[in-house]
Amino acid sequence: MARLPLLDRDDLPEVDRAVYDRLEASRGTPTGNIWRALANAPNLLDRILSLADELRHGVEIDKETRELAVLMVGLVAGSQYEFDHHWNSALKAGLPREKLESLADFETSPLFDPRDRAILRYAREATLGEVADATWATLRKHFDERQATEIVVTVAWYACVVRILVPLKIENEAWFKRL
């Protein structure tokens, strides 16, 4: 059970409902529990939503790359919520199920090419702490400066999301089904 109330739009004062409306418009699904928990601080929800939307829609890195990175963050950090939600996003982005099922073995699985391995290795190391120089050099072989910056911020953001999900004990929504 979540450690904070999971708020709906009508639970907020009228002055704060606009951010909830923006949230619902940008997500296109029923409102996720992480967002409902963050609605306890609507001012922060507003800023967090802006960053999250920019990372989803305003970057050069493709959706497949982003979702591989986010799945690795969720896997390494032990966040079932993040992993499950981004599993679905990865499938919708076009990543094959077989590849997702082999994620833990990305270093040796023939389903992953050198570019995939570079992003997954970076996401794993960055989530755990220090990124090796060799890992960074390999990442940079595949991504230019802008894309590398977007990857750094994306991985950092989703590691931050885990640091919200885990202590607040956010669980998957009753309506959520992993594909």
Give the location of each predicted region.
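Hydrophobic alpha-helical segments
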Residues: 1-179
